[in-house]
Amino acid sequence: MTAPQHPLKGRLALVTGATRGLGRAIAVSYAKAGAHVIAVGRTTGALEELDDEIQKVGEPATLLTLDLRKGDKIDGLGPTIYERWGKLDIFVGNAAMLGPLSPLPHVTADAWQHVIDVNLTANWRLIRTLDPLLKLSDAGRVILLSSGAAEGRYAYWGPYAVSKAGVECLGKMYAAECENTAVRVAIVNPGATRTAMRAKAFPGEDPMTLPAAEDVAPLFLDLARPESTVHGEIVRYREWVAAQATAATAK
């Protein structure tokens, strides 16, 4: 059994978009919980800065500089991980881009495709290459990130909203296909969070009114635990916080 302070001891976790915002907070929290983290990001310098932080709380991370638009590079990831570790316990599909906030008729084909490639297609390709490794784990965990934008209520958020709606469907479909395995799939809607992407989308908003990424990371730790039973569900951070508070009061 794992020690309470290291609930992910001995687990191998891959986190995309790990160099900033929520992805960074998740990667650090997993390392602190005892996991070995494969941190995926676009720039080597930012990954090295993350590793400096991770080494203060856990073992050095494995750093992977990867452009998620490069499908052939993603496809080779599964075999590479298998050759070195033989399995994968946790996959967090966090990487995303906002794209243009513009009327749909004004979005260029290239801009549309860029957002879909990074936010949706990359997660499908990652699932495809990592699926055999997750099924070799005694408790494979997949956590994909959605957004309130996926509900289609926000004008001018077209590419991002569509990509996140696709992620929700992708997660639910994969969950259905993993029903009779040890893999559990969760889709997380973190809600408004104090990140650079949020600041870009809402420049007039006071960021101090929002939870920090480090506040949201415990939800991802909870879902990554081997004992987590959440499967095929959309988990909303604020609802999770409320449920945690209710459970604590009941004790």
Region roles according to the model:
Residues 11, 59-60, 87-88, 134-147, ...:
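Active-site loop of short-chain dehydrogenase/reductase
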Residues 12, 19-20:
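Conserved glycine-rich cofactor-binding loop
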Residues 33-49:
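Conserved glycine-rich Rossmann-like NAD(P)H-binding loop of the short-chain dehydrogenase/reductase
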Residues 45, 65-76, 109:
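The beta1-alpha1 cofactor-binding region of Rossmann-like NAD(H)/NADP(H)-dependent oxidoreductases
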Residues 97, 135, 141-166, 171-180, ...:
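Catalytic loop of short-chain dehydrogenase/reductase
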Residues 102-104, 111-116:
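Substrate-binding pocket helix/loop in short-chain dehydrogenase/reductase
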Residues 180-183, 187-188, 195, 204-251:
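C-terminal helical subdomain
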